[in-house]
């Protein structure tokens, strides 16, 4: 995308030349899946997991390219924005007013060996947009006026924290099952004190909501 910051991070890494595709008078540069399979590196870094490949590609979506790489024994580090998760598509549309067309199936995320949340406060992300560190200037201005408004970013950040917390909970449940661990230590999560030793009144009225907020706070901090 012509970002100087990204170019600097790539220094010293082997870059696989893109596959050039001509489509409707436009030159597109796509990930060369066959070249990657031929080289068989131990690890590939690939951005934008939800990307739609150019017409004529072997797979319509980049996440399908990743699955083929994994099947061939090649490890992949990739990135995906929370708004591209299929399970959140309807919620994202309701909050932002934008229906995201490029999505990644939930199963792809669930099959990942590890998921790391890259958390950035909305104000910091907005500044990066203004500085041209996310999109080129023309694209950045359009993004700031539409999808990437501060209210939307706050909501998307919360969704990312919640989705990551859910994954941590699932991992904990598997660990408990495999190691026959009981749930007695969950009491610390189920009881939220207000500082005077009394549980928060709203949490008492809505215990399930209180527990969810506690899990979000507990696990959210753990993955930042």
Regions flagged by a language model, labelled:
Residues 1-4, 50-51, 76, 82-87, ...:
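Conserved nucleotide-binding/hydrolysis micro-motifs of P-loop NTPases
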Residues 1-38:
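Conserved P-loop
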Residues 40-43, 72-78:
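Loop/turn-to-beta-strand initiation segments
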Residues 48-63, 87-90:
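Conserved ATPase-coupling elements of RecA-like P-loop NTPase cores
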Residues 65-72:
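Conserved P-loop NTPase motor core
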Residues 83-114, 118-133:
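Conserved phosphate-handling catalytic cores of large alpha/beta enzymes
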Residues 111, 116-191, 195, 224:
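Membrane-embedded alpha-helical bundles that form conduits across membranes
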Residues 186-214, 218:
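Intrinsically disordered, low-complexity, charge-rich segments with an acidic bias
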């Amino acid at each position: 995308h012509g970002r100087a910051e990204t170019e600097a991070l790539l220094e010293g890494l082997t870059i696989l030349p893109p596959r050039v595709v001509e489509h409707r008078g436009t030159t597109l540069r796509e990930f060369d899946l066959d070249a990657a399979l031929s080289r068989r590196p131990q690890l590939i870094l690939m951005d934008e997991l939800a990307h739609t490949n150019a017409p004529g590609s072997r797979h319509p979506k980049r996440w399908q390219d990743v699955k083929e790489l994994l099947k061939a024994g090649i490890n992949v580090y990739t990135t995906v924005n929370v708004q591209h998760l299929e399970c959140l598509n309807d919620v994202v549309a309701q909050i932002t007013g934008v229906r995201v067309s490029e999505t990644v199936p939930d199963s792809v995320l669930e099959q990942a060996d590890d998921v790391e949340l890259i958390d950035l406060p909305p104000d910091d992300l907005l500044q990066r947009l203004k500085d041209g560190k996310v999109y080129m200037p023309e694209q950045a201005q359009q993004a700031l006026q539409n999808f990437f408004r501060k209210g939307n970013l706050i909501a998307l950040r919360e969704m990312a924290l919640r989705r990551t917390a859910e994954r941590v909970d699932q991992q904990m449940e598997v660990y408990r099952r495999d190691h026959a661990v009981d749930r007695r230590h969950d009491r610390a999560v189920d009881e939220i004190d207000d500082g005077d030793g009394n549980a928060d009144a709203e949490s008492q009225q809505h215990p399930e909501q209180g527990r969810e907020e506690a899990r979000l706070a507990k696990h959210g901090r753990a993955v930042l």
